[in-house]
Amino acid sequence: MSDDTPLAHSLPTPVAVLGDGCAALSLAAQADRLSDYALSVIAPAGTGSTQDHIWGFWQMPWLQDVLPLVRKTWSRWTIRNAETAVVMQAAEYPYHAVTRQHWMAHCMARATQHGVTFAEDRSSLDDVKQRHIFDSRPPKRHPDMMLQHFIGWEVRAAAGSFDDSTAILMDFRCDQTCGMHFIYCLPFSDREALVESTLFSPALVPDTFYETAISSWLNDCANVSDFEVIRREKWAIPLGLMARHDPALSGIGGNGGAIRPSSGYAFSFIQKQIATGIARVSAGNALGFVTPHRPIDLWMDRIFLSVLRHQPQHAPQIFTALAARLTGDEFALFLSGEATMALRAKVVSAMPPWPFLQALLRPEAGAKVGPP
């Protein structure tokens, strides 16, 4: 029977996703919106991460499916250094937190409900054309890449210890000797909060560096000296452009350019990438995924990363100046990849010019800024 017969056209096209991380399961959860495709997820047993951690994101149109699962929402957040504290307020785009395990369990349940198949070996790929295989395995990174690396403690303290109306996105009142370093604190209640020591640098540091920073911040800045650590998380996210895991296969998620190079934000951009791919199918195009980042944003990110690598001492002033210049909603739009040219100009005008002019003249700043 030829492929041109009506019966052949009525059969769903086999599609496979390699890996079972956030991108693979987020796509699988929406299999009901891809009725012309039969989706399978292929990952060897035991390869997926079992560590739970928090994914933060600003409310955007492509994240509606996540909203019922959020653990906490903040319309106010703070960015501060030793001299200045800026409180930002969002009217349209609040900041949310969802736990990895909660989201992944939700996606797995929906995927199973929608008939997605799961396999542990690649033998099921025999009937799948190469252009219909999407690889979500981690991309290849250069050993000298900038990293966002952190250790987080979820802590419990006495009632009234935390102000859960305001998230602390960046507090630079911590050791700045190893790169751009800040404390990130998400208060889930007046008793419980996630407190992370986050560092941007090419090299990891001993765990004691992060842990000392967390303890010191809790004691000296939050005035919380008596607390219990109820959960720990540890992660490192490569920053910049990376080659695909397998150049012969199309990528999705981090392997498809979804990680924001300057910030390491991935969760929101993975959902955006998948939403765009599904919209393309709805418009009559073949299923495929492209980077969710605009070329101009990738170029700006490359310049910004150069500043953070070579002149991290400017970071506290850069971020507090940016927070002071933008509204909360503008800040959310910019970091979510939804900036207009006017907003980008506003961001640039808030930056100290000399470090960025120096970064612009470095050879690395002129390198390729598009996806590999």
Each predicted region: which residue ranges?
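N-terminal FAD cofactor-binding segment of flavoenzymes
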Residues: 26, 30-83, 102, 151
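FAD-binding beta-loop-beta segment adjacent to the flavin cofactor pocket
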Residues: 177-180, 234-251, 307-313, 320-324
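N-terminal Rossmann-like FAD-binding beta1-loop-alpha1 element of flavoenzymes
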Residues: 4-40
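Short FAD-binding loop at a beta-strand-to-alpha-helix junction that anchors the flavin cofactor
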Residues: 185, 190-191, 246-263
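C-terminal helical "tail/cap" subdomain of flavin- and related membrane-associated enzymes
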Residues: 275-372
